[in-house]
Amino acid sequence: MAEEAKKAELSIEEVLAGTSIADVYQAAKQLDGVVKKTHLIESPYFSDLCGNNVYLKPENLQNTGSFKLRGAYNKISQLNEDERKRGVITASAGNHAQGVAFAARALHCKSVICMPATTPILKVEATRAYGAEVVLYGDSFDDAYAKSLELQKKKGYVYIHPFNDQKVLAGQGTTALEIIDELKDVDAILVPIGGGGFASGVALATKAVNPNVKVIGVEPEGAACMEKSFMEGHVATLPAVDTVADGCAVKTPGDLTYAFCKKYLDQIITVSEMEIMSALLSLIEKHKLIAEGAGALSLAALNKLPFKGKKVAAIISGGNIDISTISALIDKALIARGRVFCFSVQLPDKPGQLLHVSQVLADENANVIKLEHNQSKVTDSFKKVVLEVTVETHGHDHVQRIIKALENAGFVVDKIY
């Protein structure tokens, strides 16, 4: 509690001055042997896509599945004996929960994680598997956060904030040290922004080691709290957030992280939901890597970079995503790319019509993956049926060729998606 009180008495300028590259190097020592050094992966596909030489930093392959372990472990490892005996607490429904639980277990410290009661059971079980006591409360993160503060006050736990903490952001900054050590002539680093702790640490470390390297933050359009804060000149709050990048679904950045990002970031790029989903699909197809929505933000921003021919490190921040969610995101990305096409046609209710449609599709190399033959959907004619067909396609041009071929065969095509 003394540390929190002391920090509250300091100005933002004093906090900025009191957090340096030395803290990041100290964090690297603390993390040695605890985190994996996730080696860069050169990506010919993403390089060709954006006209730069792209290297992936796969923190989705990190212990616990994200970068969050770096900050959590660095923070908890520097608690004194009395603080560790008291135990630690936080609120999270995602990667921070697992990072804190993993770090606390490794350091023989009790951890309590407050999660919304609506948290998917797989995430709850994963957090418990690292030894944490999980408290399920409320329907939202805000409810769980309020509960964690109540328990902290009642039990005397040490709070481990997910982003607005100097030791946490110093731990996250070790990611940048690894990038620069492996790719010494890197020109730019792309880093996702949620609450801003990751971007703060990466930017601080990068600019201290090589001020010429550009550090570009990436936010989802539906949760661009840091961009809004930059535009308004102070920490600002979004009225709501809506994004598939749930790890970055933050309404308000931290005051510390706002100050660090304002000082060290060169630019913020925002990306759409479809750009995020398309990046996820490309990562799976081209690199056989799975990321969560927030993990794909850097890749989604590659086409928006204001330069060409540079060496760019894109950080894949995490890969904790459940199977049903990744399946839904892949389906939407395939539809957006014209790789899946669903349509309906009305047919006379007589033999041979389905064969006729199937022959047209076969001639156009369209692979049928779903078909529904329904008599009840036609209300204006007793002698007609509706045929709904979903096919695999090769892109938007292929879809148009299929539509034209069906129309030439006498069918009226209604595109569903």
Could you tell me what each predicted segment is?
Residues 2-417:
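PLP-dependent amino-acid enzyme catalytic core
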